[in-house]
Amino acid sequence: MVKQLINVIIAGTVVVIMYNFLSHQDILIGDMLQKESVKGAYLTGAGFLDVNIKLWIYRIISIVIIIAVYNFIRGIKKEESKKILFSIILIPAALIIVFIVNIAIDSIFLRGNDIDREKEYILQNIRATEEAYNINVENKEIAKGTDITSEKIKKDSELIEKLPMVTPDVVKETLENNTDNKEKKSLYKYGNPNLVKNGNAYDYLTTREIDDKDKTLTNKIYKYTHGNFGILTSSSKVNKNGYLLNVSEKFEGQELNGTKIKEPRLYYGENTNSNAIVNAKDIKEYDYPTSTLTNKENNYNGKGGIKLSLLERIALAITKGSTELIFNNNIVENTKVLLNRQIIERAKKILPNIRYDKDPYLVTKDDGGLAWVIDGYTVTSRYPYSQKVSIEADKGGKERINFIRNSVKVVIDAYNGTVDFYVTDTTDPFISTIMKTYPTLFKNYNELSENIKKQMRYPQYLFDIQAKVLTTYHNSDVDNIYRADDRWEVAEVSGSGTRSSTSMYTLLKKGDELKPAIITTYTPEKRKNIVSYLVGQTENGANKLTMYRYNEKSELSLSFIDTQIEKDEKVQKEMRELTTLGAELKTVRILLPYEDTTLYIKSIYQVFLNEDSVPVLKKVIVANKGKVGIGNTLKEAMQRMLTENAIDIDVRDLANEDELKDAIIKQNKTLKDVMKQGDFEYTGKDIQRLIKLVDQLEEVSKEKKKKTNIEKTN
């Protein structure tokens, strides 16, 4: 009995010591600077007290536990009650002493200015955060915003006509509700529209995958087996009646990115969930409609799938729990079964160790075939010192992470189903470990064709996370991170009704051409003026971030200027003229950087209130620097923005008077605290901030009096 008790105690001791050891590691991903005197949010990592006090506390506790257990066991063996009692008292006594010492040290250290003490550890947090999120930003100052003139519009006429004013949401809504497309609509499920290069223009490609909903099991497995490329819709033009312009809806003979598509069939896809049996006896696959009454048929001739020999049929019957394949009369020598056709699940079955982007996209191959690209990420929440952010979890809800790298590009052949994993970031420690586990699985990124590299885009999932991190870490000065004096917020760049987006794919003018990019904008915390915009671009498959900062007077946010436009009587008159019985107006807002200024584009669509109604573009409103123009096209609206009939709006972002008063009170309190600490460097900085806030309050008060006097005069 005594021996068993001793073994239990020893096992318990080992568990406690292991827990203490793991607690050492947790300090590196815990929260530092948790005291009320710290103005900013918690930073991830071990601070001065963690490294110099808490780590030693864990070590001392481990030693005390070992001594106590050793004495306890000896006391039991020799039946010495004093040793047993001493051992029982030792651990709680040590914990009480450690607790008192910890409080005393905390209070002593927090009396002085702790920025100098914590500087080294905050710097580690900054470096680790930039490394963990792969944030290598090129900063560019915008000294003076570009003035849009008639000469500039004339010179850039061709480029302006190619600027995207149509959003992916409108494209998808149109395709799904188009009454002229009923037959195709019942056959196909449309993917998310993606901006692609098509000749000299950029269009939206919306993939057409077979929709197996409401189809019999036989039709689902044998007949309706595959989708077909997609529909190309102009991102910048509509037809003469205002309907979106489908550049190409063909099922064969399409061209994309300078490559003629020879094999447009999609046997593997984003929305292809069912298995398929191809080349079955006396059964032809549906290919695509050639007219309202006739269809083209097809037989699969790809490398994908498993030939259904008797042995394979028995194995599949056991796996699927069904004997249907064994006794199936439709199976002949060339019959194959195509399994795991949903591309993300297909990749997961091969490599479950990484996270996959939920928005794959289609690219053309050198041989005229099609392939899907899926971005793969390594993600963790246990990277030492890197700042944690809250994101949408892979399976719903929220999760906190502090490391993400887009280290893998997965390329899946849409016809054959072959899967290739290309490593894009060999500096990623996690992918390096995975590569050692699966040495033959990965390919070097240089092996991927240049044609596919050119078609790759910056992943929106990664971009949004990096943009969120940069709300704080855009200014990586230690003092700024410590005091949180220069925080930004991510602003809206596009919106429609209640839906809005903080990032979007668009085209940016670069010299004399347009380049695809993903953008987001920033405003200072609780303000509406845009101080910067972040651009993500992919050059030959490599992701690149550029931060454009306004040096002088900043631009205004989309939501603010949209409200100002809606208040104008001339705009309201135009809107009333478009109002028709049985229809509603739908507005789509876009913020678009154009050289060193920003265009605020508001597209007005008319939507009839019947079940299958599509948006019809009626007007385009453009605003820039207090001037607003309305036209039938973007170019026409920009031209009218420069005429005498242009609408003037007030674009000053005057802060709320009560908010400013609260900010002054808060800043005054901060100043007093800093003066008590005797920190002359921060005293000077805080005085400057207080003066700035008082100046802003004075400006708001003057404006308020001015408006009151005008109202009295009227």
Explain the meaning of each model-derived region:
Residues 1-677, 681-711:
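Soluble extracytoplasmic regions of secretory-pathway and membrane proteins
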